[in-house]
């Protein structure tokens, strides 16, 4: 699996249980090499979430926002670049992240991101994550795969 190898090459050690929990998100578009990502969620509770996001060269996560839910303002997230280059776009403004740099995205803020030519690894730290509620600007995008 690409993500497990990339994480280990970056010095991020995984247990066998964690390796088995790596998720692949193609956003329902079946163009994973271009649009998609792989992720490992370490913890996702009512209070916090921590995950690793792995992107291949040039791979993109589509534009979206994290809306309010259950009395919360929505997910606030901090992206910390661990490896490669991340082109983060927040409300249309580019925020390039190199290894060791981070950026916090407020709840409800439109954003998308793309890996540089060597791929990228992002550590995400956030409030509770409810991916199934994400709102994408492209109506054909689905965060949770629907099997018909």
Regions found by a protein language model. Name each.
Residues 61-64, 73-75, 124, 133-136:
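A short, polar/proline- and glycine-enriched secondary-structure boundary/capping micro-motif
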Residues 62-63, 88-89, 105, 111-116, ...:
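Short beta-strand His + acidic residue motifs that chelate non-heme Fe in jelly-roll/DSBH
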Residues 78-80, 90-111:
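Short acidic-glycine-tyrosine-enriched beta hairpin
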Residues 69-70, 95, 128-130:
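Short, surface-exposed beta-strand-loop junctions and turns on beta-sheet-rich folds
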Residues 116-148:
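Double-stranded beta-helix
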Residues 1-52, 147-148:
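A short, N-terminal "cap"/entry segment at the start of jelly-roll beta-barrel domains
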Residues 34-38, 52-72:
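Conserved short histidine dyad/triad with adjacent acidic residue
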Residues 48, 56-57, 74-91:
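Glycine- and acidic-residue-biased ligand/ion/polar-headgroup-sensing regions
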